[in-house]
Regions:
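Aromatic/acidic polysaccharide-binding cleft in carbohydrate-active enzymes
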Residues: 322-336
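Conserved SAM/AdoMet-binding glycine-rich loop
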Residues: 72-76, 81-82, 86, 180-300, ...
Length: 423
C-alpha cells in the first residue's frame, strides 16, 4: 500500500515522522509524495500557534481531496488537544506513534475509527530509534519530550506533557549508529532540550561529554536551549571541543523585563545579556533567537526596550512571531491584547533588524576559513554548512555529505559565497 506523510512544525515532528516512515517501510509499505494519490495519508500536526492549527486542518482536508477513499491518520499536537473535532480514521496524540503499523492493520481488519489520546502527565518517554534519514544530510536525534516551564503564552506543555528523557545509553547507541552510517552532523532535539535528564538523574552536560567521545563523530549541534540552562560546563565544551557546533539557538522572546515577567520566562534581560557576554567569548560563535512581538500589555516603550536589547546583543538571526492567542493559556485571558496591525508593524521592524544583523555577521566572516558539511540541493546548488551555521555557496561539483574546507570570499544580500581551500 502507498502512504503519503506530511509533517508540520518543529524538529521533533520531523524526527517522529521520519521514524514512522522507517517502520512503515520495514513493513513493506511504500512511501510516496503527500500530493500523490495514496492509500493512506498521515498528517503529523502542529499546534504552536493558531496558524499551525489552521495548516493542520488544511492538510487533513487536502488528504481527503487527494483520495476520498484513503485511510486518514492524524497524529501530533493538534490532535492531542482537538481529537473530537477531527474527521479521520485513526487519531493519535503524542503517544503510540511507534504502534502505527499495528493500528493500521487493526483498522484494515475492523474498519472502525480508532482514537488513542492519553494523559501525557502520566506517560514515559516513547522509545524511537532512527538509523537512516530520507533526504537529509543531517541526522536528528530526539533526546527528550515534554515541557515543565508553562510560559503563559504556550500551549505545548498541554500537548506534549511533562519532561520525559530518553535513556542516556539509548541516545549514545543511536548517535553511534548514525555516525557509523555516515552522518556527519547530529542535531540533538527535544521540546525542552536543556531539561534533558531531570527525570532520569542525569544532565544535558553529562550527555554531551559522552557524545563528543564517540569514535569518528564529526559534529553535534544543539537545536535549542534556554539561557538559564547553559552551564559553565556546556560553555567549556563549546569553547574547547571541535565536535560541538559553534552555534546556539537561545529563545529571548522579549527584551522587556515587564513582558518577560508576564510571559513567565524565569529570567530578566540583565541575566540574559550577562550570559550572552560569557558565551561570546567562544570564537566565531553564532547566536540565533526566537522573539514574540505584540504580547498582551506590550506598549511602544516595551517594544523599544526589546529593540534596544536586540541591538546590544546582536544575534545572527532573529526568528520573529506575532503573539498568537491560544485558548487555555493564561496569556489568552490577559487584558490589553495588542491589535493585529500593531503586531504586524513590529514584526516588520524586527525582520528588518534581523536582516541587517545577519548580513553583518556574515560579512564579519569574510576571509575566514572553516570546515563544513556539503549539501547538494536538488537544483544543483552546492552549500557548505559551517560549524557556526553559515551556509556557504561554492561553485565546485562536490559529493553530498562530505567534509571540505571553505574560505568565505563575499556576501551579497545574505547569500554567502566561498572557495574551497586546503587550509
Amino acid at each position: 500500500m502507498k502512504i503519503g506523510i506530511c509533517s508540520l512544525g518543529c524538529k521533533v515532528n520531523i524526527y517522529e515522522a521520519e521514524f514512522v516512515a522507517n517502520i512503515l517501510k520495514e513493513n513493506n509499505y511504500e512511501i510516496v509524495d503527500f500530493e500523490d494519490k495514496a492509500d493512506i495519508y498521515i498528517i503529523n500536526t502542529c499546534s504552536v500557534t493558531n496558524e499551525s492549527d489552521k495548516k493542520s486542518r488544511k492538510m487533513i482536508n487536502r488528504a481527503r481531496k487527494n483520495n476520498k477513499d484513503a485511510i486518514i491518520i492524524v497524529m501530533g499536537c493538534y490532535s492531542q488537544l482537538n481529537a473530537d473535532k477531527i474527521d479521520a480514521d485513526i487519531i493519535l496524540g503524542n503517544k503510540d506513534k511507534s504502534n502505527i503499523v499495528k493500528l493500521i492493520e487493526e483498522y484494515k481488519t475492523k474498519n472502525n475509527k480508532i482514537t488513542k489520546i492519553y494523559d501525557l502527565t502520566k506517560t514515559k518517554f516513547e522509545e524511537m530509534e532512527i538509523s537512516k534519514f530520507t533526504n537529509h544530510t543531517r541526522a536528528f536525534v530526539k533526546i527528550q519530550d515534554g515541557c515543565n516551564a508553562f510560559c503563559s503564552y504556550c500551549i505545548i506543555p498541554y500537548t506534549r506533557g511533562r519532561v520525559r528523557s530518553k535513556d542516556k545509553t539509548s541516545v549514545i547507541k543511536e548517535v553511534t549508529k548514525l555516525v557509523n552510517n555516515g552522518y556527519k552532523e547530529i542535531v540533538l532535539t527535544g521540546i525542552h532540550t536543556g531539561r534533558y535528564g531531570i527525570d532520569i538523574n542525569t544532565t544535558l552536560e553529562e550527555l554531551l561529554k559522552e557524545l563528543v567521545e564517540i569514535p569518528n563523530i564529526y559534529r553535534i549541534r544543539l537545536s535549542s536551549i534556554e539561557i538559564n540552562e547553559i552551564t559553565p560546563g556546556i560553555i567549556k565544551l563549546l569553547k574547547e571541543n571541535k565536535v560541538m557546533a559553534k552555534h546556539l539557538h537561545i529563545p529571548l522572546q522579549s527584551g522587556s523585563n515587564k513582558i518577560l515577567n508576564l510571559m513567565n520566562r524565569r529570567y530578566n534581560k540583565e541575566e540574559f545579556k550577562n550570559m550572552i557576554t560569557k558565551i561570546k567569548e567562544i570564537p566565531n560563535i553564532s547566536l540565533t533567537t526566537d522573539l514574540i512581538v505584540g504580547f498582551p500589555n506590550e506598549t511602544e516603550e516595551d517594544f523599544k526596550e526589546t529593540l534596544d536589547t536586540l541591538n546590544e546583543i546582536k544575534f545572527t538571526k532573529i526568528h520573529t512571531f506575532p503573539y498568537s492567542r491560544r485558548n487555555g493559556t493564561p496569556a489568552a485571558a490577559m487584558e490589553n491584547q495588542v491589535p493585529p496591525e500593531v503586531k504586524k508593524d513590529r514584526v516588520h521592524k524586527i525582520i528588518k533588524l534581523s536582516d541587517k544583523d545577519e548580513e553583518e555577521f556574515y560579512k564579519s566572516n569574510i576571509g575566514k576559513t572553516y570546515d563544513g558539511v556539503v549539501e547538494v540541493h536538488p537544483n544543483g546548488e552546492v552549500i557548505v554548512h559551517t560549524s557556526n551555521y553559515i551556509p556557504v555557496i561554492v561553485e565546485d561539483n562536490l559529493e553530498n555529505n562530505t567534509i571540505v574546507n571553505v574560505k568565505i570570499t563575499s556576501v551579497d544580500k545574505k547569500k554567502v559565497y566561498g572557495n574551497l581551500t586546503n587550509k
